[in-house]
């Protein structure tokens, strides 16, 4: 019994830094029928967990009660634990990338629409400019055509207007001579071809009344 007490005390002295979870049963509570060999076998069994716990406490310098080691996380556990954040980190960029792609496509469509609109506006402006040029050319041609008769009539009027007294006397002589010739011609026609003259006069009257 003294030997057992000594071993228990040694075990307690080794584990002073951390209290042990398992307590050794008192010697008086042991059954009397157990042999000494069985008692010697039980004492080392009790010492092993206390030594392991003391080693854990000495390594970690924990003044409190012994803490159980965390379970080793294998690759499966690590993968399961990382499934949540991994999925979130993979799923979150997808909508952002899709939204960015949609925004780029919308911007591209808008730019194409603006380019097409500018193209049609340029074509319309060019067509309007050509139409205005053609209309200006037509107006110039009409003005030139209208100006030619005025110029000719003006030049003819300038030509017919007498520049001096001699020209006016010459015009009067020509006018009197034309009147005299016309009178002689009419008298000659009536005297020689009165039937023809009457027929011509009747035709002119009928045409005037008919119209």
Swiss-Prot record:
Q: Which residues cross the membrane?
A: 159-179, 186-206
Membrane topology type: Multi-pass membrane protein
Q: Where is the composition biased (Pro residues)?
A: 63-73
Task: Enumerate the residue ranges of region (Disordered).
Answer: 1-90
Q: Where are the coiled-coil regions?
A: 119-148
Keywords noted in UniProt: Coiled coil, Membrane, Transmembrane, Transmembrane helix
Provide ranges: composition bias, Basic and acidic residues: 1-10, 31-45
GO terms for CC? endoplasmic reticulum; membrane
- InterPro entries listed in its UniProt record: TMEM247
Q: What's the protein name?
A: Transmembrane protein 247
Lineage, broadest ranks: Eukaryota, Metazoa, Chordata, Craniata, Vertebrata
Question: What gene codes for this chain?
Answer: Tmem247
């Amino acid at each position: 019994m003294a030997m057992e007490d000594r071993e228990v005390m040694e075990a307690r002295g080794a584990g002073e830094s951390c209290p042990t979870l398992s307590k050794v049963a008192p010697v008086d509570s042991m059954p009397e029928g157990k042999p000494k060999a069985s008692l010697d076998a039980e004492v080392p069994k009790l010492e092993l967990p206390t030594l392991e716990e003391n080693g854990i406490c000495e390594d970690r310098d924990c003044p409190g009660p012994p803490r159980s080691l965390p379970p080793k996380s294998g690759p499966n556990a690590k993968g399961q634990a990382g499934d949540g954040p991994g999925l979130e980190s993979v799923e979150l960029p997808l909508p952002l990338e899709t939204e960015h792609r949609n925004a780029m496509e919308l911007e591209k469509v808008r730019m194409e629409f603006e380019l097409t609109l500018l193209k049609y506006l340029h074509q319309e402006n060019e067509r309007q400019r050509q139409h205005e040029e053609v209309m200006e050319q037509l107006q110039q041609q009409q003005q030139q055509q209208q100006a030619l008769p005025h110029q000719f009539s003006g030049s003819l009027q300038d030509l017919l207007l007498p520049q001096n007294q001699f020209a006016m006397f010459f015009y009067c002589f020509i006018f009197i001579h034309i009147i005299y010739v016309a009178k002689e011609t009419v008298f000659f026609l009536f005297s020689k071809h009165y039937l023809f003259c009457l027929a011509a006069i009747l035709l002119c009257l009928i045409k005037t009344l008919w119209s």
